[in-house]
Amino acid sequence: SSPMTLIYSDEFEEIALDLIKDCNISNSLMFEENNLNSQYENALKEGEDFTSIESTHEDLIMLMYTSGTTGHPKGAMISHQMQFFNAVNLGATARITDKTIQLVVLPLFHTGGMNCYANPILHNGGQVVLMKEFDPGKALEIIDNPEHGITHFFAVPAPFQFMMQHPNFETTDFSRIEGAGVGGAP
């Protein structure tokens, strides 16, 4: 792939600067948590109006990484059409609505986190709650807290297993969960 833009968190600045140099990336923005004057936030405030370009359903929208059924990571070329129909089909199957609030514990650089667990919810107007890093106790706390209102939770097997082994699992209120699912294991 030939990346054109890199948006990165300040915690990865050293690695990002090496990538920018090594991959000849011409555009970059650093996101700093809790800094409303970060490069990223300033770009959002001062950015130019978005100009759409003509595209087709077959045009690529992103390159995602997946281990698929083999367990070995590989780049998957995702077209506009694939992303759209994936969001529609998974959203319909899981009964996703604009009232859905999904807890996403998988990374968004991976197709599971983005295309299976985030995009279908966003496509239907729902909300996505992202965990920066998975912690079984914190995930149970988020699910248990009515202020978050989590209605859906999908993940690979490991997070489910870790949550079930956590001491707070038995006392967590799962009554608001309308949909849960597991997938992605070889």
Q: Model-derived features: where do they sit?
A:
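Conserved pre-ATP/AMP-binding loop-to-beta segment of ANL
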Residues: 46-65, 72, 95-101
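Conserved AMP-binding/adenylation subdomain of ANL enzymes
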Residues: 84-101, 109-151, 161-162, 166
